[in-house]
From Swiss-Prot:
Keyword presence, Electron transport: yes
Record carries keyword Zinc: no
One BP term from GO: mitochondrial electron transport, ubiquinol to cytochrome c
Gene: MT-CYB
Protein name, entry field: Cytochrome b
TM helices/strands, residue ranges: 33-53, 77-98, 113-133, 178-198, 226-246, 288-308, 320-340, 347-367
Residue sites binding heme b b566 per the record: H97, H196
């Protein structure tokens, strides 16, 4: 008798990816976040689909339709806040996932790492467009400020911005196209995630020691399915706590005011997960420089594999690099805090210092430390 799980064309793919997949026996809970991101994406697609059934992408009715979802649709408020806070969970898992990749040297798996960077950009674009859809004050002004950054591109900038807007300012065409793109992008993200997994399974997972585990593997099921399920329960617990007890904790009160092009909010800021990049953007006084720094703040991840001369893949046995890694984390938290503050001293100077430190750590300090650690191996 043949085993359907191992011979059926479709089941075989699932089996080789989630059941009989040979896995290192020593990967920690930090490796759970890949599956948690998959769970977040599923939650976002399902809640988003139900929201799209009631939402209208029109400047005159968008705000009212969101109010209608919260007041009149059965459990509409739950779906709306699950979707909004689900995005926060998504980014929390993303940042930990990327941080784990940096700490344990997973960037050595180049194809997987580069697809991951593409995924990060796609998720950020999707979240930005989703924030515009409720058509509150922060939605409108956030869309205006961020899309306006493209005008810093020489020659074509202004035309490009007007092309994206579909007019001479953010309006109905902008909202309609943002809704269309916000709807389609998660499916593109799903496809990219599958390619991400495909490349990962070509080489196999990294592990905390950074050593080859080919001589000692265990099947993914039941060991890691159980472990991932525990992580999923904790994620759902946190998401439901946020949604049911503190639904507006991470939102902006300004977004409960309908969009008004004639009234600018005191200080425009994006959602918390973009604040670190926003702080880097604001720390540079001229527009083109700020835009370049903003893009480089994420794109710098692509050159990390070429800036790591260390003879050990992970930071597990490299205390100097560990110390610098946690300084980098503290620096990013500082940038996140600064991004939410008004543009005045001392916040300007703190933001500039933190931005310089961020790029210095990534490009100079950490690679130099790797060279010192290589020397220390010979002592």
């Amino acid at each position: 008798m043949t085993n359907t799980r191992k011979n059926h064309p479709l089941m075989k793919i699932i089996n080789n990816s989630f059941i009989d997949l040979p896995t290192p026996p020593n990967i920690s809970s930090l490796w759970n976040f890949g599956s948690l991101l998959g769970a977040c994406l599923t939650i976002q697609v399902i809640t988003g689909l139900f929201l799209a059934m009631h939402y209208t992408a029109d400047t005159t009715t968008a705000f009212s339709s969101v109010t209608h979802i919260c007041r009149d649709v059965n459990y509409g408020w739950t779906i709306r806040y699950l979707h909004a806070n689900g995005a926060s969970m998504f980014f929390m898992c993303l940042f930990i996932h990327v941080g784990r990749g940096l700490y344990y040297g997973s960037f050595a798996l180049l194809e997987t790492w580069n697809i991951g960077i593409m995924l990060l950009f796609s998720v950020m674009a999707t979240a930005f467009m989703g924030y515009v859809l409720p058509w509150g004050q922060m939605s409108f002004w956030g869309a205006t400020v961020i899309t306006n950054l493209l005008s810093a591109i020489p020659y074509v900038g202004t035309n490009l911005v007007e092309w994206i807007w579909g007019g001479f300012s953010v309006g109905k065409p902008t909202l309609t196209r943002f809704f269309a793109l916000h709807f389609i992008l998660p499916f593109i993200i799903s496809a990219l995630a599958m390619i991400h997994l495909l490349f990962l399974h070509e080489t196999g997972s990294n592990n905390p020691l950074g050593m080859s585990s080919n001589s000692d593997k265990i099947p993914f099921h039941p060991y890691y399915t159980t472990k991932d399920f525990l992580g999923l329960l904790l994620l759902i617990l946190l998401l439901m706590t946020l949604t049911l007890f503190y639904p507006d904790l991470l939102g902006d009160p300004d977004n409960y005011t309908p969009a008004n092009p004639l009234n600018t909010p005191p200080h425009i800021k994006p959602e918390w997960y973009f604040l670190f990049a926003y702080a880097i953007l604001r720390s540079i006084p001229n527009k083109p420089g700020g835009v370049v720094a903003l893009i480089l703040s994420i794109l710098i991840l692509a050159i990390i594999p070429f800036l790591q001369p260390s003879k050990q893949q992970t930071m597990m046995f490299r205390p100097l690099s560990q110390f610098l890694f946690w300084i980098l984390v503290a620096d990013l938290l500082t940038l996140t805090w600064i991004g939410g503050q008004p543009v005045e001293n001392p916040f300007i100077s703190i933001g500039q210092t933190a931005s310089i430190l961020y790029f210095s750590l990534m490009v100079f300090i950490m690679p130099m430390t790797c060279l010192i650690e290589n020397k220390m191996l010979k002592w």
